[in-house]
Amino acid sequence: MKEVELAGHKVRLYDSIDELPIVRFHKYNRFLLVDAGIGSDISDYDAHVERAIAYIRKGDTDNFAKEFENLRQNLFLIMSECSPKYLSFACLVESIDGKPQEDLSQEGLQKVLDLLGGASKKDVTEVLNSVKKKIDDELALYFPTLFDDVKTREYYDEVKRLTATLLAQIIDDTDRKSVIDDIREHLLLFSKPKRFSGKDGLEVVHDKEFATMCLLITKETGTEAKRMNVLEYYNAYDYIRQKARKAQNKAV
């Protein structure tokens, strides 16, 4: 557990996969998905507009439509002052001033944020980033085949290429504008927009996949999956995955 002081309150947060309940982790991830794909502030709005313009210029009407729909949802979240990023933080709060915080409904999580309303966004974001990094590092250490983020590495490889090209342009005094523009556009459109609304929206799919996996783990292990912590859940998931792979290899 991590203990911090926010807005004059003593806050205990789950920061380890051997303590964090899987149901909380699922909710936490769900809000992070929304924050990454939609966001809830003006900088996210600007990013949606920039990407939408880029898709129109490329004639990519399908991704433009998705981006525009996400922009509309972003505006709704801004106007309703509902932040998925801070709701993800609330999912990790175990207790405030010794009082357990067990209501994981959106209303319950919002009450946690209201109670800590005196804390600055900067302070909350710093705590969230610190805890998120620790959880991510533990998952990558224990389950490298499940949490090896290849896409993130590819993105930062492109950032390095952009930096190297900009430096080369300065050193060689050569015009590399077209190459630089291509890399910047690639970075801008690196992550394709996801659909969040409707029955096939990312949130619905995320919840359905979790429910299905919980049923499978409970059946295979005889233990209620939703009562597991993150470490136990992914140990079970990894075991089932390896078992299925061995059975498939034998069949061949």
What kind of region is each of these model predictions?
Residues 1-252:
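An amphipathic, hydrophobic-aromatic interaction surface with interspersed Lys/Arg
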